[in-house]
């Protein structure tokens, strides 16, 4: 029996085939669209990442120090405040508040001086009592030397080649990264110090087998903690200038002292509350203030014109100052970068060989005046509450104001590496923003420096609590940003400098305009960590004037709630995430179109599901409607039947066997069994 199958194709199979083909095509199209959108968004983010890297590369190079070419308006700027220490000796001492004492792993010190003495202390930074950490810049036998102790051993780095007590002006730079240190005077060769290997760890590894197991982990942790303490300058308390407290008085000139963002001489010239001046100390020239409308410059030798690094802003507290209504905001300090390695892991990361001759450091004070226009002549003045609230004047940046400011000769907001800012062609800088940072604690930090460890981060940066407000014209309003160390995504179109505040001409008829009350809007819930934690209580007697808004790119953009404070203009806060309100991202870099991605994904999923269902239905149909074959029976044998109609001869042949069987049965019956 051989089966012969006859294939039966249903007629609807020809109709289903185009449908399946269309589903497959739709799935492929949806996946391609999704991948295209993802690719475009990834390409956009990659381009933004490259742009951010470009900006970061323009700001730090090596990583923890920001280097850029100075604009023409700053090249040849003066060295800040200058003091002369007389023969009787003097002392300028800055004291950190008890709750703001920093601990650092990287320190940078720069100062210009001219003297004729052979021995004296220029600057000394000391830690809290009983800790013993210090950094001291002094002159010994007519040569510059820096001695520091961040653990148990005094480490000295000295300029051995040339004496500096020749009465000429010299600039000295000192940089410390952990136990590594560099010292450079003018353009002379760099003196370096690198610590030797950790002998404690080596001895521990040798004796590890003999230490009981339960003591191995505590000993190892103790050694690591000891090594960590030997790289951190803990709890810095005072900065002493002049050496009169150490019986090694300095005589001569000191200019533009810079230490980790603090310009102590400028702060002393402005009468900072935390600075005390004793002895024979005299200020040379006028007091460098940020409210002076004119910029004073002094010529420098041509060999002192080189690259500059951007540093942070020091804001002095005003709670203890008397007879002052607005606080003084100190401007940024620009220091020429040195050729040392500025990375914390110098043993693992090689230094850049492009700085082989060294570059000169000049402390440069950039004076950008800021004028706080009055809000209204009929508004009574309310003094600041003692909560370290700095008064910030927010001036909206529009196309017209930028053009007016450029024509008036005010420098552009962002001048990092761009020479076109120096041209007086009146071009509009639509992408620039005005960045105003207020830190009531007076603590400063460098946003380009990543936090090195927990101790450095929480002791140095945790006290900076106030917001950083920045304006940009393409959004048509203000943006309230988080502190700089949390700012990861938003980058303006052009780099702007924190702390550089540029004066904008006051709005016309601001004094004579009538004060109009501002209706308070219900403030939504603000996410934790996004805004200032301090409660803002608006004063009922204060009348605030709203500023004219600039052109709005998005007509559907909601206006955020306003935060009102005494002597503050109406400042829109960041838009929190509230149902029913569409949040506008702060920058174009965060705008990602999701409609095409969602559509492609949905089409792909639906097409794939339809294809699977069709395949399953087809398989079930084939299983249930299997083709039944036609069988051909070929009977080539005739079987013998036991019926009575069969041939008699056959019956006779079978009879003997029947008899034999019948004969055997009686024999079986005749058997007897005995038990």
Curated annotation (Swiss-Prot):
Question: Which family does the UniProt entry place this protein in?
Answer: Belongs to the neurexin family.
Assigned keywords, A-Z: Angiogenesis, Cell adhesion, Membrane, Signal, Transmembrane, Transmembrane helix
List the ranges whose topology is Cytoplasmic. 621-675
Name where it's found: Membrane
Basic and acidic residues bias (residue ranges): 665-675
Summary of the function given for this chain in its UniProt record = Neuronal cell surface protein that may be involved in cell recognition and cell adhesion.
Q: Nucleus: is it a keyword of this entry?
A: no
Q: Report the residue ranges that make up the Laminin G-like domain in this protein.
A: 81-281
Source taxon at top rank: Eukaryota
Q: Which SMART domains match?
A: 4.1m, LamG
User: How does it sit in the bilayer?
Assistant: Single-pass type I membrane protein
Q: Where is this region: Disordered?
A: 313-337, 490-534, 642-675
From the UniProt record, give one GO term of the biological process aspect: cell adhesion
Q: Which Pfam families match?
A: Laminin_G_2 (PF02210), Syndecan (PF01034)
Question: What is this protein's name?
Answer: Neurexin-3b-beta
Residue ranges, compositional bias (Polar residues): 325-335
CDD domains attached to this UniProt entry: LamG (cd00110)
Give the signal sequence positions: 1-30
Query: Taking the first listed entry, what is the main subcellular location of this protein, grouped into a coarse class?
Result: membrane
Q: How is it modified after translation?
A: Processed by alpha-secretase leading to the formation of an extracellular soluble protein as well as a C-terminal membrane-embedded fragment (CTF). Proteolysis of these CTFs by gamma-secretase releases intracellular domains (ICDs) and extracellular peptides.
Query: Organism source for this protein?
Result: Danio rerio (Zebrafish)
Residues passing through the membrane, by range: 600-620
Which GO cellular component term is one of those annotated?
Answer: membrane
Topology Extracellular: residue spans: 31-599
């Amino acid at each position: 029996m051989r089966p012969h199958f006859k294939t039966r194709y249903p007629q609807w199979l020809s109709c289903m085939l185009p449908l399946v083909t269309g589903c497959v095509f739709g799935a492929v199209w949806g996946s391609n669209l999704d991948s295209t959108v993802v690719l475009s968004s990834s390409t956009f983010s990659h381009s933004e990442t490259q742009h951010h890297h470009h900006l970061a590369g323009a700001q730090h190079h090596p990583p923890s120090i920001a280097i850029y070419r100075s604009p023409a308006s700053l090249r040849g700027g003066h060295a800040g405040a200058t003091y002369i220490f007389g023969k009787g000796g003097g002392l300028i001492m800055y004291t950190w508040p008890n709750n703001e004492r920093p601990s650092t792993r990287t320190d940078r010190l720069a100062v210009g001086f001219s003297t004729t003495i052979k021995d004296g202390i220029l600057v000394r930074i000391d830690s809290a009592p009983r800790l013993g950490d210090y950094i001291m810049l002094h002159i010994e036998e007519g040569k510059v030397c820096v001695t520091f102790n961040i653990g148990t051993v005094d480490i000295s780095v000295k300029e051995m080649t040339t004496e500096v007590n020749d009465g000429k002006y010299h600039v000295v730079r000192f940089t410390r990264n952990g136990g590594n240190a560099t010292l450079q005077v003018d353009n002379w060769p760099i003196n370096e110090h690198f610590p030797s290997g950790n002998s404690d760890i080596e001895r521990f590894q040798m004796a590890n087998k003999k230490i009981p197991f339960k003591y191995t982990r505590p000993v190892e942790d103790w050694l690591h903690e000891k090594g960590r303490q030997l790289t951190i300058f803990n709890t810095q308390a005072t900065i002493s200038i002049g050496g009169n407290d150490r019986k090694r008085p300095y005589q001569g000139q000191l200019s533009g002292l810079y230490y980790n963002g603090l310009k102590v001489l400028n702060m002393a010239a402005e009468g900072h509350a935390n600075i005390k001046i004793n002895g024979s100390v005299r200020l040379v020239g006028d007091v460098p203030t940020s409210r002076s409308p004119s910029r004073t410059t002094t010529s420098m030798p041509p060999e002192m014109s080189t690259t500059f690094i951007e540093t942070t802003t020091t804001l002095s507290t005003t709670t203890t100052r008397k007879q002052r209504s607005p606080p003084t905001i100190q401007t940024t300090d620009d220091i020429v970068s040195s050729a040392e390695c500025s990375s914390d892991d110098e043993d693992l990361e090689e230094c850049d060989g492009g700085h082989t001759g060294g570059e000169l450091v000049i402390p440069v004070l950039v004076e950008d005046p800021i004028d706080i226009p009055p809000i209204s002549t009929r508004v009574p003045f309310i003094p600041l509450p003692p909560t370290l609230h700095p008064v910030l004047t927010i001036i909206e940046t529009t196309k017209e104001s930028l053009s007016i400011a450029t024509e008036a000769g005010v420098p552009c907001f962002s001048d990092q590496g761009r020479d076109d800012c120096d041209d007086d062609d009146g071009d509009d800088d639509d992408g620039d923003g005005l960045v105003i940072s207020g830190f009531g604690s007076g603590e400063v930090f460098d946003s380009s420096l990543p936090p090195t460890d927990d101790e450095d981060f929480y002791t140095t940066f945790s006290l900076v609590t106030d917001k950083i407000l920045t304006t940009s014209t393409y959004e048509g309003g203000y943006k309230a940003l988080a502190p700089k160390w949390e700012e990861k995504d938003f980058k303006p179109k052009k780099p702007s400098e924190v702390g550089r505040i540029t004066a904008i001409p006051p709005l016309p008829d601001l004094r004579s305009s009538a004060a109009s009350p501002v209706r308070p809007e219900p403030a939504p819930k603000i996410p934790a960590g996004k805004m200032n934690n301090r409660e803002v209580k608006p004063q009922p007697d204060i009348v605030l004037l709203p500023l004219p808004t600039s052109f709005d790119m998005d007509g559907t953009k909601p206006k955020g709630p306003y935060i009102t404070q005494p002597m503050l203009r109406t400042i829109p806060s960041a838009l929190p995430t509230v149902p029913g309100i569409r949040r506008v991202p702060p920058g174009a870099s965060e705008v990602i179109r999701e409609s095409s991605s969602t559509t492609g994904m949905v089409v792909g999923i639906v097409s794939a599901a339809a294809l699977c269902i069709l395949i399953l239905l087809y398989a079930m149909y084939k299983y249930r409607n299997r083709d039944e074959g036609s069988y051909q029976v070929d009977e080539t044998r005739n079987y013998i039947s036991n019926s009575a109609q069969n041939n008699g001869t056959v019956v006779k042949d079978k009879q003997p066997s029947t008899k034999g069987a019948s004969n055997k049965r009686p024999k079986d019956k005749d058997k007897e069994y005995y038990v």
